[in-house]
Amino acid sequence: MLIYTHENCVAHEVPQGHPERPDRLVHLLKHLKETGVTDDFPLKSAPKIGSAQVNNAHGSRYFFSLGEKKPNEGLEALDPDTWMSPRSLDAAEHAAGAVWQGVNDVIGGTDQRVFCAVRPPGHHAEYDSPMGFCLLNSVAIAAINALEIPGINKVAILDFDVHHGNGTVDLCKDNPDILVCSSFQHPFYPGRLHDIHRPHIVNTPLPSGTAGGAFRHAITQDWWPAIHAHQPDLILLSAGFD
């Protein structure tokens, strides 16, 4: 297994008390080192995503607009939840770059599995809109661009989180070659695009407090048939953990 991260992902600053803060990644990396995981799987430095890959998913105007919003100092609110600091876009480019490099490593045979320890997250970022702490939709960018690699005809994105992966659905809803399975608490934020039902878009809403057994049953019932029908050449896990 390969593990990608980048020091600039910690440099994405947010207001004090914000739930998606640098401490999350700092503590994760510390735990990986203290438990010896990094002895077997040394941390690799994530490259930046290329503008061509971002534009292929989000469109050229969106990437440019994020650069325009980047503050030279302090913090800039994009919405009540989503903030930019001077190095936030750089962090997002490395986060997306980690996923894209991981895809290339797996497809190229370097390894079979890649874990990306990065921030800011991405699954709420829609085609032309940041939201929910997210700037670039790393997993959707990787999935969309992976389809241009010879031998990759189908991709599956499996998204588990307390929040629906609205951005990933938005970016992939018109591309039947990308299966998106998203489990989430409902009703809850963001309340967008969760009611789309297509063969390649599988939304699995769950009530608050759903236990592990019920979660596994829902995944087995909703996701496995779709995955087997889709026959993906590449699987991307979009892991929220909250």
Where do the model's predicted regions map?
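HDAC/HDAC-like amidohydrolase catalytic core signature
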Residues: 1-242
